[in-house]
Amino acid sequence: MNYAKLSIAFSKKTIKTHNCRLFQRWLHVGDKVHDFRVVDTKKVPELQLNYTRLKHEPTNADMIHLDREDPNSVFSIGFQTPAENDEGIPHILEHTTLCGSNKYPVRDPFFKMLNRSLATFMNAFTASDFTFYPFATVNTTDYKNLRDVYLDATLFPKLRKLDFLQEGWRFEHADVNDKKSPIIFNGVVYNEMKGQVSDSSYIFYMLFQQHLFQGTAYGFNSGGDPLAIPDLKYEELVKFHRSHYHPSNAKILSYGSFPLEDNLSALSETFRPFSKRELNLPNTFLKEFDQEKRVVEYGPLDPVMAPGRQVKTSISFLANDTSNVYETFALKVLSKLCFDGFSSPFYKALIESGLGTDFAPNSGYDSTTKRGIFSVGLEGASEESLAKIENLVYSIFNDLALKGFENEKLEAILHQMEISLKHKSAHFGIGLAQSLPFNWFNGADPADWLSFNKQIEWLKQKNSDGKLFQKLIKKYILENKSRFVFTMLPSSTFPQRLQEAEAKKLQERTSKLTDEDIAEIEKTSVKLLEAQSTPADTSCLPTLSVSDIPETIDETKLKFLDIAGMKAQWYDLAAGLTYIRLLLPLKNFPESLIPYLPVYCDACLNLGTHSESIGDLEHQIRRYTGGISISPSAVTNNSDVSKYELGIAISGYALDKNVGKLVELINKAFWNTNLSNTDKLAIMLKTSVSGITDGIAEKGHSFAKVSSASGLTEKTSITEQLGGLTQVKLLSQLSREESFGPLVEKLTAIREILRGTSGFKAAINASPTQHEVVEKALQKFMKSRGVNQQTQTKSTSKERNGINSIKTYHELPFQTYFAAKSCLGVPYTHPDGAPLQILSSLLTHKYLHGEIREKGGAYGAGLSYSGIDGVLSFFTYRDSDPIRSLSVFDEASEWATTHEFSQRDIDEAKLAVFQGIDSPVSESQKGMLYFVDGVTDEMLQNRRKQLLNVSANDLKAVAKKYLVNPKKSYTAVLGPKSEKQLPTWVIDKFES
């Protein structure tokens, strides 16, 4: 620190500074900087940060700054935006504010900035009662650029009607070039929310919240109900912005090592046109009610789960005002005591007993609303068991109110909190920016919310008699009349009813259209298409240049050594936590057993051992470690995509003092699991498929990409078997088996193969002082297996069959589609890999975004390139017309061979690519690219040089070779049954 550069002058408690971040540490309550008055300062040692809260006196804007030695600095501005109906105004406004502003009138500056920046994070979010716009970057110029774009976008947006029609909703012909085609609803948010109602967990939670919070802003869908979105008028959107997007209603957060003074100066200048305004916002506080409420609704039938066990139900209790940080913390801990882990009382009573397969989406304590809600919910239940479940819930609470909880359980939870504070991710600031606003907007003191140590001290003091949680149960559960019982029953006709409701809505609206209205719709469609097709003049937007990209990598200093007979790498950390990763390569592993590897890995942490129950084992894991993970691994050879290495990956971390215990627990879980415990195996399988369809609906583009890529190489075929729709079908089948004998035989066979397999390797990220204790622990681990360690280097290279069909259509009960087309590229070390990586960014931003999102209305689209796997994948997300999108994929490939890319285009693509490459890596993850994928620093540096040198000719050459004339390409679509004839497709049906 250079204190000589610090210049501070005091004049009537007003501070003037010369651009130095150190001044904020000297600020006191009452000081004034650029119209901002300091109202609070605190040190938060457990998070290693200094907290400063300020008020902008002319407008009353609220700001907090979290000063921390972290170059990945964050900025966010948010506004309280409680919904007033189901039309999705807050959500659509979130989109349209980012479509051009006074200072930056270009269409869609948000997406344009994605490839003019080195941001490590850029996004915007609409919650139930607020909207916020966060970003993060390690580059100071970039930070200022993005801050200016975000501030102008939110406070001075253009809010053009054409942007509203594109992002929100519009009428248009199904084929915009055919006036005889039917008129439909379209729009980005409209299709996004149609995709959301494909998720039964989302439907359950939204219906639950709307019924419970009726009469408050939470009773409306802030994201928008697809049946209500077409009722929204453009003028209402503009009015909502004027009333809500104002500094008086704003909360600003900055985090990291960049100067606070610069932010205050920029904000003060931006806020200059505004004056303080009194706010009149809808009520968000739910008052108590005198008697229990009950509601039954209907939701979709899951094709993966057993039809008779798909009821979701919950009993909810109104709890505290969440602005009370300390009581909120205590209720969060109570929730963990009740629901977390195999030995928790509600898991044992509701799931282990077989009454349900998993907790419902709203289970536990929810503090994201102004009034906290404590819920006990279950999914995978039968309708006949509802009364029994309800009686059991009250019986358990009565028992807990009498007996309380074992102190060991509480200590394990507090240990997890302690270790999580020490385990810092590379995106720690964004994590705070995404979690803090929920309570901040609801009146909580952010300083109290951040001070975890004070919360724990308060908890221990209040629980000194050991009865705090019993008192909370009596107060908020047993003596609480404000109860709400909500149940959602499955309906096989639910998707059909949604489609019929949409058709009815469309018919009602279009039947009222006059000839003049239709002519205006067609005229507007032409205008919108022209605007979308006109190249944007982005000269007004700030940008970084390729020269801002460092030419050399930061070297990862690894030590290579032999530990307990294993080849190992070591990365030095400061004392505190020790991270251990183990990888066991599987050579010539039986093909028939490969799909069962995920089941085996899950079994290791779900069944317990012959001498310890899974509840006891899990308690030890929580008490002594930060967690243990066991999973299958499949990695492509970085010099030959036809080769790959299959394996088992094991990882865990603990406080330095608990490393011996960590490895002991890994040993128990990996080598000594009781695979014959079929009762627990049945529960594990049923839980694994519970809600799995919702996961597909949320990440449908990923499943589509995996499906379409599965026929390209041996490794991509294995990836699909381990984590694609093939695995989903296997889990569904296994979960319905009446006898688990055959499965136990397969799992036992896998363990015997693992016992006889050599080649373990290790990666340790820890303090050098930990070497001896780590070696002793790993020696015990290796001896317990009873096999001599021998390194194997031969890669698996046996032909495997992927998906045989060129085009596969996966029928699922969704409201929108996901499409993907995959082609084979090159291995990581091949020189064509760099231009393919740049090309994927170019086509995403310069062609696919405009053609599929803007014109087609899909929520997302792009071209991804996996440098390790050598796979190019076109994809769409929540798409209304996947067949059209597949044609656009082909058009994009041709366009890439004929379009004259400017140097600006290429430079922007390079910036976008390096956002990912240079994204900060936490200390705990250093060296993992080499450990897992075998990519050395030399390879990384060579790839970096190739990327920086990519030319327009390189791009055209690889586009023609790998996209227009691919050696192999496969296509997949996920979605509802197609109305179109698909004679050349293989139809893959998911049926209950």
From Swiss-Prot:
<protein>
    <recommendedName>
        <fullName>Presequence protease, mitochondrial</fullName>
        <ecNumber>3.4.24.-</ecNumber>
    </recommendedName>
</protein>
<dbReference type="GO" id="GO:0051603">
    <property type="term" value="P:proteolysis involved in protein catabolic process"/>
</dbReference>
<dbReference type="Pfam" id="PF00675">
    <property type="entry name" value="Peptidase_M16"/>
</dbReference>
<keyword id="KW-0645">Protease</keyword>
<dbReference type="Pfam" id="PF08367">
    <property type="entry name" value="M16C_assoc"/>
</dbReference>
<dbReference type="GO" id="GO:0004222">
    <property type="term" value="F:metalloendopeptidase activity"/>
</dbReference>
<comment type="similarity">
    <text>Belongs to the peptidase M16 family. PreP subfamily.</text>
</comment>
<dbReference type="Pfam" id="PF05193">
    <property type="entry name" value="Peptidase_M16_C"/>
</dbReference>
<keyword id="KW-0862">Zinc</keyword>
<feature type="active site" description="Proton acceptor">
    <location>
        <position position="94"/>
    </location>
</feature>
<dbReference type="InterPro" id="IPR007863">
    <property type="entry name" value="Peptidase_M16_C"/>
</dbReference>
<keyword id="KW-0479">Metal-binding</keyword>
<feature type="active site">
    <location>
        <position position="167"/>
    </location>
</feature>
<dbReference type="Pfam" id="PF22516">
    <property type="entry name" value="PreP_C"/>
</dbReference>
<dbReference type="InterPro" id="IPR055130">
    <property type="entry name" value="PreP_C"/>
</dbReference>
<feature type="transit peptide" description="Mitochondrion">
    <location>
        <begin position="1"/>
        <end position="30"/>
    </location>
</feature>
<keyword id="KW-0809">Transit peptide</keyword>
<dbReference type="InterPro" id="IPR011765">
    <property type="entry name" value="Pept_M16_N"/>
</dbReference>
<dbReference type="InterPro" id="IPR013578">
    <property type="entry name" value="Peptidase_M16C_assoc"/>
</dbReference>
<dbReference type="InterPro" id="IPR011249">
    <property type="entry name" value="Metalloenz_LuxS/M16"/>
</dbReference>
<comment type="subunit">
    <text>Monomer and homodimer; homodimerization is induced by binding of the substrate.</text>
</comment>
<keyword id="KW-0378">Hydrolase</keyword>
<comment type="function">
    <text>Degrades mitochondrial transit peptides after their cleavage in the intermembrane space or in the matrix, and presequence peptides; clearance of these peptides is required to keep the presequence processing machinery running. Preferentially cleaves the N-terminal side of paired basic amino acid residues. Also degrades other unstructured peptides. May function as an ATP-dependent peptidase as opposed to a metalloendopeptidase.</text>
</comment>
<feature type="binding site">
    <location>
        <position position="192"/>
    </location>
    <ligand>
        <name>Zn(2+)</name>
    </ligand>
</feature>
<keyword id="KW-0496">Mitochondrion</keyword>
<dbReference type="GO" id="GO:0008270">
    <property type="term" value="F:zinc ion binding"/>
</dbReference>
<keyword id="KW-0482">Metalloprotease</keyword>
<dbReference type="GO" id="GO:0005739">
    <property type="term" value="C:mitochondrion"/>
</dbReference>
<feature type="binding site">
    <location>
        <position position="91"/>
    </location>
    <ligand>
        <name>Zn(2+)</name>
    </ligand>
</feature>
<dbReference type="GO" id="GO:0006627">
    <property type="term" value="P:protein processing involved in protein targeting to mitochondrion"/>
</dbReference>
<feature type="binding site">
    <location>
        <position position="95"/>
    </location>
    <ligand>
        <name>Zn(2+)</name>
    </ligand>
</feature>
<dbReference type="GO" id="GO:0016485">
    <property type="term" value="P:protein processing"/>
</dbReference>
<dbReference type="GO" id="GO:0005758">
    <property type="term" value="C:mitochondrial intermembrane space"/>
</dbReference>
<dbReference type="GO" id="GO:0005759">
    <property type="term" value="C:mitochondrial matrix"/>
</dbReference>
